Amino acid sequence: MTTQFACSGIELELFRYPSQQASNLQAWDAADEHLVKYLIDTEITATTTAILNDNFGALTCALTMQYPHSELLVETDAKTSLLGYQQNLLHNKLASTNIHWLNSRETLPQNIQLVLMKLPKNLHYFGQQLARLSTVLPAGTQILIGAKAKSINPALLASIEKNLGPASASLAWKKTRVISCISDGKKRSLAKAVSWNVDELKLTISNLANVFAANKLDIGARIMLDNMPKGEFKHIIDLGCGNGILGLHAKQCYPNAQIHFVDDSDMAIASAKHNWQANELDTPSQDLQSQDPQTEQMPQAFFHWDDCLSNLPADVEPDLVICNPPFHQGEAITDHIAWQMFVDAHKRLKKGGLLHIVGNRHLAYHVKINRIFKNCTTVASNGKFVILQAIK
């Protein structure tokens, strides 16, 4: 893995976040380089530039170095990306005083003069981002989108025009292209969150645009729901919660428990919180109700936008961690997220606490869990998925 970013006279040392990742993964790709090269070659300048989907800060750091007095509005849905930006700015001794941090649900400011963005893997989310931009960008604003050349096709360009304005792609460079879009000034309405019913659980689930499994239960979650651990648990973490379906069902299985929903995606956390409230699950049982009517009832759900369990309050000692680990980080296929989840779960579980996870068979999670917990049991399996359990 190289950490030396060099493009159009800009030199940086960049790391993924967390930095202890597989040596074959780096913190930027050729599309980042192409965007920087295109911007400098065409001498486009702006006093206020919005940056969207910058994986670990290559664009943010490059523009901070090249245009130190310009205002940057940097938006991300991923906590690890935000932490990566801050890590790389600090490492390269770049000031962040000109940067305003935005999450993926905040109202965009009206003063944006230029937009740089990477094409995300989730095209539904991409369409929503473009529609959000249309609500604030005046006609004539330029949007530059970096992407792999193989990802660009007439349907994508038509989608950009539908959601924001006419678009065209540059010549290929290092197997990437830069899409240039000019805002047409028309405000689009934003799509509503997708909702559906899980009849067997009597739950209604709603997903914001960047949440995995947009309109149905994924297969891994379904087998997990059918195989929740036996026993009574008081403090449960739904790690990598997505829309919160596992944590919601945990409340049904263990009605007196406190549930902590944790995810790297801000939209996932917002979806999980909405689903908890929409299904009216925050109704404490008699055991959790205060004897004093003047005292606020103890909440049963807590929501954490976090890099695994890195910033979970120190007083949270779970006796159960349930987890459906992702094996993608953006475009990269990697097992470091699952590894970090298992390590963090082992650190935070109380003695005798249980890790209960579902994963694809081919990922061989049992090997990793055994290394950390010194035990691992197969609870259930089918042709594709396996449910594993380990005790601290």
From Swiss-Prot:
GO terms for molecular function: 23S rRNA (guanine(1835)-N(2))-methyltransferase activity; nucleic acid binding. Keywords: Cytoplasm, Methyltransferase, rRNA processing, S-adenosyl-L-methionine, Transferase. Disulfide bonds: none annotated. It comes from the Bacteria. Its EC number is 2.1.1.174. It catalyses: guanosine(1835) in 23S rRNA + S-adenosyl-L-methionine = N(2)-methylguanosine(1835) in 23S rRNA + S-adenosyl-L-homocysteine + H(+). GO terms for cellular component: cytoplasm. It is an enzyme of class 2 (transferase). It is found in: Cytoplasm. Its main location: cytoplasm. Belongs to the methyltransferase superfamily. RlmG family. Specifically methylates the guanine in position 1835 (m2G1835) of 23S rRNA. HAMAP family: 23SrRNA_methyltr_G. This is Ribosomal RNA large subunit methyltransferase G. It comes from Shewanella frigidimarina (strain NCIMB 400). The lineage of its organism: Bacteria, Pseudomonadati, Pseudomonadota, Gammaproteobacteria, Alteromonadales.
